[in-house]
Amino acid sequence: MTKLSGSDSKSTLYCSFCGKSQHEVRKLIAGPTVFICDECVELCNDIIREEIKGGVAARKDGAVPTPLEICQHLDAYVIGQNKAKRVLSVAVHNHYKRLANSGRGEDVELAKSNILLVGPTGSGKTLLAQTLARFLDVPFTMADATTLTEAGYVGEDVENIILKLLQSSDYNVEKAQRGIVYIDEIDKISRKAENPSITRDVSGEGVQQALLKLMEGTTASVPPQGGRKHPQQEFLQVDTTNILFIAGGAFAGLEKIIGDRLQGKSIGFGAHVAGPDERRAGEVLKQIEPEDLLKFGLIPEFVGRLPVIATLEDLDVDALVKILGEPKNALVKQYKKLFDLEEVALTFTDDALVAVAKKAIERKTGARGLRSIVEAILLDTMFDLPDLTDVVEIVVDKDVVEGRKDPVRVYADKAKEAAGDAA
């Protein structure tokens, strides 16, 4: 469109889309009776690229990634847990294969298989779910089950999970309906008592009931601005039928329930009291059955919505040492990169890595505790580093990890002397 400038007789041209004048943009392209500026062209290109990119885009031919391809990608970021990776890879492949063939009108309708991850704290449950979503390029959100309550009670509504998924897809409902939801700490919403109670359990059984419909597939009415503060807002309708739900939890004490079942343990006078099981918790969890989850406090309908169960083992010293150094985004690699930015090399000796792993096992924090241990070791060094001159390398050995000495600083002149001696 053309508007006349009030200050002079010359006409000023304006973008038909954003309304900016030719003086406010770099380029204005003319069409029959319309104009478009370079900024709007760039925005349109971004929108088109985003639309093309949407969906499961791990392969160029558009096919759903095979279980082997999914598992190989998980191997690059997650150490160990091979059984859990295989279970996840098959379940996710089948889920997105089901979506790819959903519109063909065949007689056999494929049901959705949500996934339950059971394993100790710091064994990699959350990392597996995050890595999967990143590889598949689908919207992903995490929810903490401990903050959820039934609608109408103080706490977070279950529908807020779908709102977070919508936000991660930029409110693209179509994309959100093919996303992945990871619900952490699912064991914390177990029923407080094994038998149903007449009192209302709004953060336990009540949340399980509220999650049931979402997980099996329903049309959820989601408030774009959050639950209760904006009652007049229009609701978005999101079909959860094709959203993959992955639930994870440590289920502390579940191994005892499994052990009791396996031993057929009786209760009362004269009952055989079993000694402590020498096997690690992860080994016992491999023999999990749905009835064990019911005894733990999950309701039957909820267990039924999670037909695929993958168990993770607690990590030993060897696995934690590998986690420190082997994955693409390994912790040691991250700190080396930080030191590289200061033009200083960072070296961890092999015995230092073993000592860090042993500390994490003592704290019973698994892989999650590794960062806090390494951070504590390097804190003072990182504080001083920007002001240090002539330091070319920081060396961390076993004595440093165990607190017997500070990280060793190697200065430029000593490094030159060492190089000369070696020659």
Swiss-Prot record:
Residue stretches making up the ClpX-type ZB domain: 3-56
InterPro entries given in the database record: AAA+_ATPase, ATP-dep_Clp_protease_ClpX, ATPase_AAA_core, Clp_ATPase_C, Clp_protease_ATP-bd_su_ClpX, ClpX_bact, P-loop_NTPase, Znf_CppX_C4
Binding site for ATP: 120-127
Binding site for Zn(2+): 15, 18, 37, 40
Keywords of the record: ATP-binding, Chaperone, Metal-binding, Nucleotide-binding, Zinc
GO biological process, one term: proteolysis involved in protein catabolic process
CDD domains assigned to the protein according to its UniProt record, in alphabetical order: RecA-like_ClpX
Listed NCBIfam families: clpX, PRK05342.1
PANTHER family registered for this protein in UniProt: ATP-DEPENDENT CLP PROTEASE ATP-BINDING SUBUNIT CLPX-LIKE, MITOCHONDRIAL, ATP-DEPENDENT CLP PROTEASE ATP-BINDING SUBUNIT CLPX-LIKE, MITOCHONDRIAL-RELATED
Assembly with partners or alone: Component of the ClpX-ClpP complex. Forms a hexameric ring that, in the presence of ATP, binds to fourteen ClpP subunits assembled into a disk-like structure with a central cavity, resembling the structure of eukaryotic proteasomes.
Protein's UniProt name: ATP-dependent Clp protease ATP-binding subunit ClpX
